[in-house]
């Protein structure tokens, strides 16, 4: 149970949204805003994501420490995610991002020293990036094998989850495949023929302690240089309008392409070749799994 929280929670309206952060104690976010201004969601995610989001978060961290002096404080600095996905870990842009984050951490340490506040700082990484140059579309594969069903509504192709025998929820280099009973073998055999990494059925998931009740009936991992996209349409003109925008709720999976803006169409790109960094596969060289 946390006593102090600030986390983005925009209020979605009919054709817009109000940027807001949920906070605890009540009105703590509003107090922070008085000192450093509103948290701008477009800095945090989307084609305009930048170090400004991390700067705001570090400044909010300083205010939290100064006003509440918590015993334990977790702060998420998102900046490395942007260059990591757009350019990959081998890029000069990613190295620049590392230096920028290093400066932010240094700034926080200097603040703690100036306040004579004794804190031990532990820096944790959620994941390591892999350089990628390929993308796989599990939902298109299921669609082409008549396992994922779609409906044409207003000239656009939408997934019919009720009638589908299987569909994929994609997240970077991992894809959860949800399958109706009786089709597990068929789906598994289809993906065994694809250029992917591994397939984990429920038995293998249990062995690896990843058999959550919400896990897919099978879980796919990609090859190291590849990642999974959520796309299901085979003709670009049939793609629903929301797929061209930053829309984290209606897409069946994470979409790194939301970091890319197509200047010609003024929309989010569908060009999977733009992504150069991803994560999620098991590092066999450094893992006991």
Where do the model's predicted regions map?
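His/Asp/Glu-rich, glycine-adjacent segments
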Residues: 1-88, 100, 169, 179, ...
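Surface-exposed helix-capping loop/turn segments at secondary-structure junctions
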Residues: 70, 109-119, 197-203
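Residue-level preference for the first positions of well-ordered beta-strands
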Residues: 70-74, 120, 217
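Short, internal active-site loops enriched in acidic
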Residues: 79-82, 127-130, 225
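Short helix/loop capping segments that flank catalytic or ligand/cofactor-binding pockets
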Residues: 84, 132-133, 140, 145-151, ...
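Short glycine-enriched, charge-decorated loop/helix-capping segments at active-site entrances
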Residues: 89-94
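Metal-dependent active-site segment of extracytoplasmic phospho-/sulfohydrolases and closely related
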Residues: 99-143, 147-148, 220
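Active-site neighborhoods of enzymes that stabilize oxyanions during catalysis
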Residues: 159-289
């Amino acid at each position: 149970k946390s006593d102090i929280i600030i986390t983005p929670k925009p209020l979605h309206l009919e054709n817009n949204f109000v940027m807001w952060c949920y906070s605890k104690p009540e009105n703590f976010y509003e107090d922070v805003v008085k000192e450093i201004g509103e948290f701008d969601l477009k800095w945090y995610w989307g084609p305009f994501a930048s170090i400004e989001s991390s700067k705001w978060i570090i400044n909010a961290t300083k205010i939290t420490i100064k006003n509440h002096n918590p015993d334990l404080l977790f702060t998420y600095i998102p900046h490395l995610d942007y260059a990591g996905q757009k350019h990959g870990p081998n890029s000069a842009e990613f190295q620049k991002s590392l230096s920028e984050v290093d400066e932010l951490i240094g700034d926080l340490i200097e603040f703690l020293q100036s306040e004579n506040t004794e804190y031990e700082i532990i820096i944790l990484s959620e994941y390591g990036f892999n350089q990628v140059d390929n993308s796989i579309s599990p939902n298109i594969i299921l669609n082409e094998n008549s396992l994922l069903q779609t409906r044409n509504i207003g000239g656009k192709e939408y997934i019919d989850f009720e009638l589908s025998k299987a569909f994929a929820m994609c997240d970077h280099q991992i894809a959860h495949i949800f399958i109706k009973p009786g089709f597990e073998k068929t789906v598994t055999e289809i993906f065994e023929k694809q250029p992917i990494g591994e397939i984990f059925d429920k038995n293998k998931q249990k062995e690896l302690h990843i058999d959550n009740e919400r896990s897919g009936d099978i879980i796919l991992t990609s090859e190291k240089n590849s990642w999974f996209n959520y796309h299901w349409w085979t003709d670009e003109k049939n793609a629903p309008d929301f797929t061209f925008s930053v829309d984290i709720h209606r897409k069946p999976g994470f979409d790194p392409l939301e970091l890319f803006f197509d200047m010609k169409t003024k929309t989010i790109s569908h060009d999977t070749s733009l992504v150069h960094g991803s994560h999620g596969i098991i590092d066999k060289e450094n893992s006991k799994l």
